[in-house]
Amino acid sequence: MLPLTEENKHVAQLLFSSGTCPRCILRFCGVDLPAPYKHPSKELLNELQKFLEPEKPELILEAPNPPLKKIRLHEDGIDNLSEDGKEGVSVTEDESMAEKPSKLRVCNVCLGILQEFCEKGFITKVCQKVEASGFEFTSVVLSVSFPPQLSVREHAAWLLVKQEMGKQSLSLGRNDVVQLKEAYKWITHPLFSEELGVPTDGKSLFEVSVVFAHPETAEDCHFLGEVCRDCFKPAKNKQSVFTRMAVLKALSKIKEEDFLGQFPCPPNSPKTVCTVLEVECTHGAVFVAGRYNKYSRNLPQTPWIIDGERKMESSVEELISDHLLAVFRAESFNFSSSGREDVDVRTLGNGRPFAVELLNPHRVHFTSQEMKELQQTINKSSDKIQVRDLQLVTREAIGHMKEGEEEKTKTYSALIWTNRAIQKKDIGFLDDLKDLKIDQKTPLRVLHRRPLAVRTRAIHSMKTHYLDEHHFRLHLKTQAGTYIKEFVHGDFGRTKPNLGSLMNVTADILELDVESVDVDWPPALDD
């Protein structure tokens, strides 16, 4: 039984006679229970036809009296009893039987979406494509894109029903109509879940996107472009100005009389159903974090390409991410880290925290043992880098790497050269300097990628180790973001004070190592 009342009968008949499908009729009658929509289309059609059939006049005749018209004998004995218990027969006029079309008409509102494209057969075909895509997933979210002209047709049907109900002193608000996407979700989500064996979840990282089109009615929206020009502005990456949001905006602005003067109400019946343009599977990004050591003084952190020409054969990013890309079967990646070192700087100690965002990965489930094996594979592939603490993390956890980045500290070891001969006593005062404030203009070497500014940084402590008349080793603990090379040589006076000005010499840096990046992330793992 359909959850429709006598009050709905006139509207249902009006829509049905204009070519609207049973499920859309339920929507316009405000049926907001999922269960009725889930019945098969043909079953709903039969139920609707029964609901709309005129009541059959039934005459209870005395048995001895002959019937005056063609009679229908009911096999059910209870139906053949009159009110006083006497046996009787019911009489039905042939003319009162509603005609039942042998073939389903394409709905003039949903263009077949709620007819052919939410039945089990269609869902099975979509799920076959999903399973063939090779993605790992434990839940799924279904995303559907309907042709924008459906909104125009729905608006026309709503105006039709609203006018009809107004004649009965009843009202129908736009929000009283169950949304097409909502009804589609009620029907298809349980079928998808059953077919794929996983729950449907609006927050799932795995998305199945189904895009519908209906070329036959593609011009339904075009009159809105003339009436509401300001709603349809060309946008980049959009094949048509008639997007769903633009159409909805125009429909909210257009006057009823203007709409009715431009578009048929009820909408005309199409000859064809919608077509499926594509079924696409995508998986949200997954994130891998760890720490890396860099042992080469001839390796950039990221690919070094100038004017399309590669300057170095590899990079830290590639040596790590290429392995992750292959194992996770991802389409691409984004690499980030807690700071960066120059091509000629080593990163020692516990390494530098890094994270890799893997986009549209096909494989996403890894045990801790599998992550250890992946780490070993990366480490065996090159003697220029090593990684540790390799682990899967959440998007939110990536924020810990960047939190308070400039308040963090880093320690360095630098080999210093001076232009004039020095003695051990000439560098001893540096050990006593604490929290030295320096002002650094953006270094000349990075002006091409960072804005010009003066940044105040802190040298928290220094420790010296004398080597010979022109060399000593300097250990520094600094505020993150300090340019160490510029602190040593002064960058033509752009860093003040600098090591040269403090010692009254010309100083330069020959070697630099990062000894620690004091960020307590990602969590250390047992080897």
UniProtKB/Swiss-Prot annotation:
The active site is at D342. Residues 440-455 are annotated as: RNA binding thumb loop. Disulfide bonds: none annotated. Zn(2+) binds at C21, C24, C107, C110. Keywords: Coiled coil, Cytoplasm, Isomerase, Metal-binding, Mitochondrion, Nucleus, Phosphoprotein, tRNA processing, Zinc. Its EC number is 5.4.99.25. Proteolytically cleaved during TRAIL-induced cell death. Cleaved, in vitro, either by caspase-3 (CASP3) or caspase-8 (CASP8). Belongs to the pseudouridine synthase Pus10 family. Interacts with components of the microprocessor complex DROSHA and DGCR8. This is tRNA pseudouridine synthase Pus10. The gene is Pus10.
